[in-house]
Amino acid sequence: MTAIFRSASADDARFTDFSNQFLMAMPGMVNDELAGTVIYICEHTPRGALGLVLNRPTDLTLASLFERIDLTVAMGPTADEKVFFGGPVQTDRGFVLHAPAGDYSSSIRLGDLALTTSRDVLQAVAEGQGPARLFVTLGYAGWGAGQLESEMSQNAWLSVAADPVIIFDVPAEERYPAAMRLLGIDPLMLAGEAGHA
């Protein structure tokens, strides 16, 4: 997998890269699909951004996903792990965030993690040979050129450096408050709308 978006140019000097960050939706977000979410930003360039929603499990398990795509399952405890709603874009396509990166045919490295969209990583997981840590989604959250920056300037999101522990080890329902705590914020103390004096 090559980079989703192309390299930045000299004209993009003021660009702020949110790659490898968590975005937490602020209370009051009007986009119902992303309200209350924490998103890991996999890639962000001046051309756009791609992220995965971390706290919206589906009813689908890895075992049932593998059955649907005709993979023979020989795996153990990961069979019951949930597949997540990664976002509203390409919801029929799988995205696997994993560590270690490994050598799969369609991957991009994201620091110590990798994002893979090819079937070979799922085949390796089904055979019990896959990455030690994985997070599987259907779909992704995407932003066009300047869209994420605009939403950030409107205070739709808070951002903080991503922590893989939250992605792989924290239960889905606790990921949003855990990401907020990285900023020292208690999500219960956030109001839905800013007040005016």
UniProtKB/Swiss-Prot annotation:
Q: Which Gene Ontology terms of cellular component type are present?
A: cytosol
InterPro entries per UniProt: AlgH-like
Q: Which domain of life is it from?
A: Bacteria
Disulfide pattern: none
Q: Which family does it belong to?
A: Belongs to the UPF0301 (AlgH) family.
Note the HAMAP family from the entry.
UPF0301 (MF_00758)
Instruction: Tell me what this protein is called.
Output: UPF0301 protein BAV3012
